[in-house]
Design a protein with these regions (language model features):
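Conserved, structured core segments of small domains
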Residues: 1-111
Length: 111
C-alpha cells in the first residue's frame, strides 16, 4: 500500500428514502428548519449531505448524509437526533460504510 492509500478514510453513509404522498411531503416541510438546525449543529461531523431528487430533478424524495466517522453507532446517534428521523418521514434508511479513495476529503487521489 502506498502512502496515499493510507490516507483513505472510512465514512458512514446514510441514504434515507422519503415516504410517498402529500402527508410525507408536508412533514418534510414542517420539520425542515429543525432538520437544518440539527445538521448545522453537527456540520463538523458531516463530509457532505443534501436532499435526493426524483428523476424529474425537482421532487425531493430523500436525504443523503455522509458522516465523518468509521463508527456506525455514532452515525446512528447523529441521525436519530435529526427531526426528520424523529418525525418518521423516511420510508427506509440504509446505512453503509464508504472508504473514500479520491476527493478533497483525502487530498485528491489515493493511488
Amino acid at each position: 500500500m502506498n502512502d496515499k492509500a493510507e490516507n483513505r478514510k472510512m465514512f458512514v453513509v446514510a441514504y434515507c428514502k422519503d415516504k410517498v404522498g402529500e402527508e410525507a411531503t408536508q412533514e418534510r416541510h414542517t420539520h425542515m428548519q429543525g432538520h437544518m438546525d440539527h445538521v448545522a449543529s453537527i456540520v463538523d461531523h458531516i463530509a457532505l449531505a443534501g436532499p435526493m431528487y426524483a428523476d424529474d430533478g425537482e421532487t425531493i424524495n430523500g436525504s443523503m448524509l455522509v458522516y465523518k466517522t468509521d463508527k456506525i453507532d455514532q452515525a446512528c446517534e447523529w441521525l436519530k437526533g435529526d427531526p426528520y428521523y424523529q418525525a418518521n418521514i423516511w420510508e427506509s434508511v440504509e446505512i453503509k460504510f464508504i472508504k473514500v479513495a479520491l476527493g478533497d476529503q483525502v487530498g485528491g487521489l489515493t493511488w
